[in-house]
Amino acid sequence: MNHYSFSSLIRALIPLSLVIVSAVWQPAALADTRHIIVDSGDSALSKEAARQSKEQWDSTRSLRNKVNNRVEKEFDKTEKSIDGREKCNASYNVNAYWENTTDRCLDRRTGRPVAP
């Protein structure tokens, strides 16, 4: 009979222990709450950041244009120099030579510019 009471005690304690564990676990689960804030992105802070970004973009625009124009100008100058050298070297005028320092095609006898 003692054996029977011990097994019935175990059978009663297992569900009771599960209830106690779940009760202890519940406040911890309730304490961990999540807040979700839905924002359309039209807050004053985001508008100010967008305005500042646009202002910075506009202020650097003229500088970017100047840099791009300078790069294009240097490229055109180099391209013109290369084309002139090729024309001068391919010229049938035997007295024509290319001077690198001035980027011009000159006559050997007179030193004047020659049109190749």
Swiss-Prot record:
The keyword Ribosomal protein does not apply. Coiled coil: none annotated. It holds the Pfam family DUF1283. Residues 1-31 form the signal peptide. Keywords: Signal. InterPro entries: DUF1283. Belongs to the UPF0482 family. NCBIfam families: PRK13659.1. This is UPF0482 protein ECA2253. It comes from Pectobacterium atrosepticum (strain SCRI 1043 / ATCC BAA-672).
